[in-house]
């Protein structure tokens, strides 16, 4: 109320001309209502004053602080699906799942075609000796066996009676020179020789003086006794040499040799193809082992067992397939083939090997086997 009275007082104090000019100015304006500029009121309160003019625009103020963010609008409608992107990298392998239950067994398939026979494997180690079996029934008498190996030389027996003169033997090898013996007594005079060719007649000589009568000659019996003593001494030396040779042969054969009858099997322990093995034995003065009896085969088997290696034999069927012969070309007089052998597996088995069990098998000559020479 007080503000209203102050406004009326200001209007009354203004000059009349000024008021009229102001009224004219405002009369030209479009007035929506008669009470727009002058508020209508009762007579008691007086007229309100006019609005003042707008002042000049002041300088721009500093930028105010940002207002609080408005409330988020509602989510818009989803846009159209974009194009398919490139394939991503494979992810890491996941952990294996639990093992599934065993499915039912399927029906048995048809039997496959038998594969080709594999190559014979290496020789296995000799098995342990099995338990002794029960004695079987007594068999029939077998054929007479071969002559066994010569036994050890026995001790010298008592001197027997002189036997009849034997046939002249084959000259023996030259023995070791013995010590020089004592000079023997002069032998009996031999028979007179046949007269020589007649020489030219010589000059007649003077008659000589008769010589003294010679001494009586010794009897021939002591000469026979002396010869007998010499023969006995030579026999003792021969026996000594034979014993020494037998002992030397045993030492030489141990442990890589075997003697049976007049044969000696010897190995140096190395393995070679057949051709090289054959050449080595030939250069040493022998040939590859050629067992011609069960005894010789058993002696050779001992060397094979000691070395635990199969060994080549000298026989081949390179000339006629299936017909094995010795190096001399003669047919076999003894054989000890394993069951089902020889079978010429692969069409290239022309040589023979002996296993640790003493059985024979045909084998390719290019394979390497133990070298055993025969002397």
From Swiss-Prot:
Modified residues (S-nitrosocysteine): 35, 40
A Gene Ontology BP annotation from the UniProt entry: lung alveolus development
Gene Ontology cellular component annotations, sorted alphabetically: clathrin-coated endocytic vesicle; collagen trimer; endocytic vesicle; endoplasmic reticulum membrane; extracellular region; extracellular space; lysosome; multivesicular body
Record InterPro entries: C-type_lectin-like (IPR001304), C-type_lectin-like/link_sf (IPR016186), C-type_lectin_CS (IPR018378), Ca-dependent_lectin (IPR051077), Collagen (IPR008160), Collectin_CTLD (IPR033990), CTDL_fold (IPR016187), Surfac_D-trimer (IPR015097)
Domain C-type lectin intervals: 260-375
Coiled coil: 223-252
Sites carrying sugar chains: 90
Residues spanning the signal sequence: 1-20
Compartments where found: Secreted, Extracellular space, Extracellular matrix; Secreted, Extracellular space, Surface film
Main location per the UniProt record: secreted
Residues the record lists as 4-hydroxyproline modifications: 78, 96, 171, 177
Biased composition (Basic and acidic residues): 50-65, 204-216
UniProt feature, compositional bias: Low complexity: 66-86, 116-132, 138-150
Location of the Collagen-like domain: 46-222
Positions of disulphide bridges: 281-373, 351-365
Molecular function, one GO term: carbohydrate binding
Miscellaneous comment as given in the Swiss-Prot or TrEMBL entry: Pulmonary surfactant consists of 90% lipid and 10% protein. There are 4 surfactant-associated proteins: 2 collagenous, carbohydrate-binding glycoproteins (SP-A and SP-D) and 2 small hydrophobic proteins (SP-B and SP-C).
Family per record: Belongs to the SFTPD family.
Protein name (database record): Pulmonary surfactant-associated protein D
Gene responsible for this protein: SFTPD
């Amino acid at each position: 109320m007080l503000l209203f009275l102050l406004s009326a007082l200001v209007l009354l104090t203004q000059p009349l001309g000024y008021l009229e000019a102001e009224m004219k100015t405002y009369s030209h304006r479009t007035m929506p209502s008669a009470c727009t500029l002058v508020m209508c009121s009762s007579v008691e309160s007086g007229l309100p004053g006019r609005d003042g003019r707008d002042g000049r625009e002041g300088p721009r103020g500093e930028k105010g602080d940002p207002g609080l963010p408005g409330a988020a609008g509602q989510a818009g409608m989803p846009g159209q699906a974009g194009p398919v992107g490139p394939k991503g990298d494979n992810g890491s392998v996941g952990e294996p799942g639990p093992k599934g239950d065993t499915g039912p067994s399927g029906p048995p398939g048809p039997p496959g075609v038998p594969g080709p026979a594999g190559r014979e494997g290496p020789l296995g180690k000799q098995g342990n000796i099995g338990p002794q079996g029960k004695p079987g029934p007594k068999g029939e008498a077998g054929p007479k066996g071969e002559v066994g190996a010569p036994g050890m030389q026995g001790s010298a027996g008592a001197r027997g009676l002189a036997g009849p003169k034997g046939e002249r033997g084959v000259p023996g090898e030259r023995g070791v020179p013995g010590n020089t013996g004592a000079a023997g007594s002069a032998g009996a005079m031999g028979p007179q020789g046949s007269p020589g060719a007649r020489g030219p007649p010589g000059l007649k000589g003077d008659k000589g003086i008769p010589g003294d009568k010679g001494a009586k000659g010794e009897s021939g019996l002591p000469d026979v006794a002396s010869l007998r003593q010499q023969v006995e001494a030579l026999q003792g030396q021969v026996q000594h040499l034979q014993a020494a040779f037998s002992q030397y042969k045993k030492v030489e054969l141990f442990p890589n040799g075997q003697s049976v009858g007049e044969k000696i099997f010897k190995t140096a322990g190395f393995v070679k193809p057949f051709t090289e093995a054959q050449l080595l034995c030939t250069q040493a003065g022998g040939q590859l082992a050629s067992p011609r009896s069960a005894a010789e085969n058993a002696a050779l088997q001992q060397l094979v067992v000691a070395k635990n290696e199969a060994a080549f034999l000298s026989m081949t069927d390179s000339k006629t397939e299936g017909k094995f012969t010795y190096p001399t070309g003669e047919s076999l007089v003894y054989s000890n083939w394993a069951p089902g052998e020889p079978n010429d597996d692969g069409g290239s088995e022309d040589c023979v090997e002996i296993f640790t069990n003493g059985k024979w098998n045909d084998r390719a000559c290019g394979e390497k086997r133990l070298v055993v020479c025969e002397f």
